[in-house]
Amino acid sequence: NLLTSPQSLYCDIKYIENISPVVDNDGKILFYCIFPFTPATGFEIFYCVLKPGCNHVSQTHKNGRTEYVMVADGEVEVAVGDNIYQLKRGASIAFDASAEHKYINNGIEDANMYFVLSYK
């Protein structure tokens, strides 16, 4: 009922500039953990900046079920097993998180991506 006082609803707003990134590949890749894994959700969400020239071999996620990647800006080459996919802004891919995979930025600008790693 709109006339009664509303109950407190859960809302958690995050800003990238307030999150310290995990830096890898000599500073060519930055991972920002936006929402860490919790058993209640069964997933975690990251924002990633892949610098030009970066070739990042990702760890396989033995406990992960599906990895979802959404390209926000730039272009990235995603290798999953023996398959290679060219993704650009607006493209998304989902794959078995336990598969060997890597991310390559052959472009001249940053590739910005969102990752969702599902464990359910």
Protein language model regions, located:
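A short glycine-rich, His/Asp/Glu-containing loop-to-beta-strand
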Residues: 21-54, 58, 116-120
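Ligand-binding loop in jelly-roll beta-barrel domains
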Residues: 27-30, 41, 88, 97-120
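Short beta-strand segments in beta-sandwich/barrel cores
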Residues: 55-56, 67, 74-79, 92-93, ...
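Short, conserved beta-strand element in jelly-roll/cupin
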Residues: 47-50, 61-78
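Short C-terminal boundary/hinge segments that cap the last helix of small helical domains
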Residues: 1-13
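Short histidine-centered beta-strand/loop micro-motifs
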Residues: 57-62, 104-106
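Short acidic-glycine-tyrosine-enriched beta hairpin
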Residues: 81-97
